[in-house]
């Protein structure tokens, strides 16, 4: 699982892992699993029905670090520098949130950031991660409109400033909304190919969306949907 891969792989000197686990009203795990015996692991029980934004907020509030990384449980890391490379981007004060190159199980790109044109879509989905891409877009860190909540790093202070992840979204788009809220504070969303994270549950953006979620995203940030200052059509 992701916890084992983090502990075995990561070269970052000081980190904790907060595992948000689903429990029932009696405090019993809904989906039992075992974790390594490691003092860096903290459990945060979540006893509500599934709600991604609420779980993200719950995990962030249970953590203690100045920088927080949200990771889906269907991700996997195999490069020591995956964490240091995304956290390192936050040394730039105008960057609010950072994401890695997300990979499909076969090594192709799952997401190289998210474009808002013509509607929220994963950039370079299905393309080779071994290629530099059009104009080198796969080889350099750059600004994007948004990134996936499957893996994103941000400062706790900025999380608090924008009120965390909006819990008004039922299924999708709370991650994009978070990036938009940071942008409204003058903070950029960055993506770096120097950090690569597998996302086994990767799907086409919007494949499981709730229509009301998209309507809410459109009502809040519709002025940005349909245009993108950072993406090109063949990126």
Segments the model singles out, each with a brief description of its role:
Residues 82-86, 138-163, 168-198:
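A short, conserved alpha-helix in the catalytic core of glycosyltransferases
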Residues 4-14:
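Short, acidic, metal-binding catalytic loop of nucleotide-sugar glycosyltransferases
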Residues 68:
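Short aromatic/hydrophobic "clamp" motif used to bind/position activated sugar donors
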Residues 75, 79-118:
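Conserved donor NDP-sugar-binding/catalytic core segment of glycosyltransferases
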Residues 46-63:
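Glycine-rich, basic loop-to-helix element that forms the pyrophosphate-binding segment
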Residues 14-24, 42-46:
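Short beta-strand/loop segment that forms part of the nucleotide-sugar
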Residues 21-32, 76:
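A conserved acidic beta->alpha catalytic loop
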Residues 96, 106-107, 118-143, 148, ...:
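C-terminal, non-catalytic tails of nucleotide-sugar-dependent glycosyltransferases
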């Amino acid at each position: 699982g992701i916890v084992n891969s983090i502990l075995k792989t990561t070269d970052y000197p000081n980190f904790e892992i907060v595992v948000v686990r689903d429990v029932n009203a009696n405090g019993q795990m809904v989906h039992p699993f075992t974790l390594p015996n490691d003092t860096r692991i903290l459990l945060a029980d979540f006893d509500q029905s599934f709600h991604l934004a609420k779980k993200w907020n719950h995990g962030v509030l249970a953590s203690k670090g100045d920088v927080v990384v949200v990771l889906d449980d269907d991700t996997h890391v195999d490069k020591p520098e995956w964490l240091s490379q995304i956290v390192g981007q936050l040394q730039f004060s105008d960057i609010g949130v950072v994401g890695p190159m997300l990979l499909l199980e076969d090594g192709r790109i799952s997401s190289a950031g998210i474009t808002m044109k013509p509607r929220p879509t994963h950039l370079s989905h299905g393309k080779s991660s071994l290629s530099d891409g059009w104009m080198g877009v796969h080889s350099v860190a750059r600004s994007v409109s948004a990134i996936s909540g499957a893996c994103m790093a941000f400062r706790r202070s900025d999380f608090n400033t924008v009120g965390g992840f909006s819990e008004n979204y039922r299924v999708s788009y709370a991650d994009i909304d978070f990036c938009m809220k940071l942008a409204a504070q003058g903070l950029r969303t960055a993506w770096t190919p120097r950090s690569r994270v597998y996302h086994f549950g990767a799907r086409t953006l919007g494949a499981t969306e709730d229509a009301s979620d998209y309507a809410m995203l459109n009502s809040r940030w519709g002025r940005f949907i349909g245009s993108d200052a950072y993406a090109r059509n063949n990126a």
